[in-house]
Structure formats: C-alpha cells, structure tokens
A protein has these predicted regions:
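Polar, surface-exposed loop/tail segments
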Residues: 82, 95-129
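Edge beta-strands of extracellular beta-sandwich domains
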Residues: 196-213
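Histidine-centered active-site microenvironments of extracellular/periplasmic hydrolases
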Residues: 41-71, 118, 202
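Beta-strand-rich modules
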Residues: 176-197
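Substrate-binding rim/cap in mid-to-C-terminal beta-strand-loop elements of soluble/periplasmic
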Residues: 56-98
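Active-site His/acidic residue clusters
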Residues: 1-17, 53
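Extracellular low-complexity, O-glycosylation-prone stalks/linkers
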Residues: 141-162
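Conserved aromatic anchor
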Residues: 130-139
Length: 213
C-alpha cells in the first residue's frame, strides 16, 4: 500500500530475517538428522510500475522471483517464463513421486530439478493439421505425442488420450492430422523420458476445415 520506497524495503528485510530462521532450521535438520530438504522461496505476484497493487498484466505485475537450495538445476530455472506452475512438478520429481499419466498430462509446469529433454512446446494450425514444435535440451530418445478431443478432466472424468505420433526428440516437432472429426478444442501432450509438456489448441466450431473454403 506504500509503493516503492524505504517502507517497502524495511519489510523486505524483515521477511528476509524470517526466512533466514527457516533456513537455519533446515540446515540443523540436515546435519543432525541426516535429512535432505528442498527449499523453494518465491513471491506470489509482482507489483505495478510504482510498486503498488497486484493482479495486473504488466511485465512487472506478472513477474516473480524464485530461489532454491538445489545445487543443480536444469535450464527451466533460467527461463524467463519460470513460474509457480513449475514448483509442483519439481517437488514431485525431487520426492520421487510417480504421478499418474492423466494428471501429469494436465500439469502446466516443468520440473527445474533433474534432466530436461524438451521445452517451449508451441502449435500452429495449418489446414486441418496442427504443427507442433518444441525446443531440444537433450536430443536423445523419442517423443510420444498424445491428443484428446475434449476436456472431460474438468468434470472429474478421464480424457480419451490417443497416441498420434512417435518421433525422435531431436526432430523438434511433428505434424498431426486432425482427421474428419471436428472439436471445439484439442489437447496435446508430448512425453519423453524425462519431460512432459502440454498445450491446448482451440478451434472455431463455426468454421470447420474444408479443403474447398
């Protein structure tokens, strides 16, 4: 409520002192009880250009900072779009949790812990096809591409995921033919040995594809 200035700085220092106490407790647990802890500290949002408010769409309002005690992070941690969504998959990978496939396909983030095969999944519509592309971090193995023609998951049901392609990770993408069945939305998930990415590809139901249009 006070914007940029000494008052805000004072409370940043106070918060930093509280986090320091947590960090000292973590180091004690690791030393005295042979435990391994993952610590991630981040803000919930940014502020506007003058240091006020939240919920805006400016670069500063949308930007957060993040810090972790992980000694080794992958390239995801350095991406400009690193976000809150990356925290959950990072925790799951650190803890060794086996996330069910249907849940993993819904996760919007990527782990910044452990190896990363691909990142930055994009799509482009061309006639009745969707051209998927991704950037390669480690060019080994294959990428399995899955597609769902609905979003039953939103109603607590299972989506009908169909594997539509398998290509080398190093190809950096593939083209998926949507066939003759129209849908309002297509969901895609790309799965490699170490990474799962997803995106939604909306379609205008009032303008179905026709080779004659």
């Amino acid at each position: 409520i006070f914007g940029d200035g000494s008052f805000s700085d004072e409370y940043v220092y106070k918060e930093d002192a509280l986090i320091a106490k947590v960090w000292e407790a973590v180091k004690y647990r690791e030393k005295e009880h042979n435990e391994e802890w993952l610590v991630i500290v981040l803000t919930d949002h940014g502020r506007d250009e003058l240091g006020y408010g939240h919920g805006g769409q400016s670069d500063r309002a949308r930007a957060i900072w993040m810090s972790t005690n992980l000694k080794e992070v992958n390239g995801q941690f350095a991406e400009p779009y690193l976000s809150h969504a990356d925290v959950n998959p990072t925790i799951c990978k650190f803890m060794g949790f086996e996330v069910p496939r249907d849940l993993a396909f819904e996760s919007d983030g990527s782990s910044f812990y452990g190896p990363r095969d691909i990142y930055d999944l994009q799509s482009h519509n061309y006639d009745n096809k969707v051209m998927l592309s991704w950037k390669v971090d480690q060019g080994k193995g294959n990428a399995r591409v899955f597609m769902a023609r609905d979003n039953k998951f939103a109603q607590g049901q299972k989506d009908d995921w169909q594997e539509v392609a398998t290509v080398p990770v190093s190809d950096g993408g593939c083209t998926v033919d949507l066939g003759t069945v129209d849908s309002k939305i297509y969901k895609f998930a790309v799965q490699t040995d170490n990474t799962i990415l997803n995106l939604w590809n909306p379609r205008d139901p009032n303008r179905p594809y026709s080779p004659n249009q």
